Amino acid sequence: MDKLDWQKLIHIKVHCEDVESFIKRFGCDYDVFVNDRAYFNAVAMCVFQIGELANSLTPEFREKTKKDMPWDMIRGMRNWLAHSYGEVDAEVLWETANNDIPKLKEFCIKVLS
C-alpha cells in the first residue's frame, strides 16, 4: 500500500474514533444531537474531514477497495456537507455517524493491520 494512503487511513480511523467518542460523551440520543450545536458540528466536521481524506486517497487504492468501501459515497457526503449552505439533513448525518462510521473504522483497522 502507498505510504500516503496508509497515513490517510490512520487519520480516517482517528476521525471515526472521534465520532464514536462524541456519541459516548453526548449520548446516543437523536434529539440531543439535533439540539446541541457543539455535538452536531463536531460530528459534521469529522465526517467532512473523512470525506476530504477519502478524496485524497490514490485512485488505485479506491479502485482496489471499492467493493469493501463506497468511496464515492463518502466523498459525496463531504461535498454535501460543504455545499449544503445550512441545509444539512440531521437525520442523514445521524445515521451516518451511527451506522456507517463504525463500518469505516473497522475497514481501516482491517487494512492497517
What annotation goes with each model-predicted range?
Residues 1-113:
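Solvent-exposed interaction patches of small proteins and small membrane subunits
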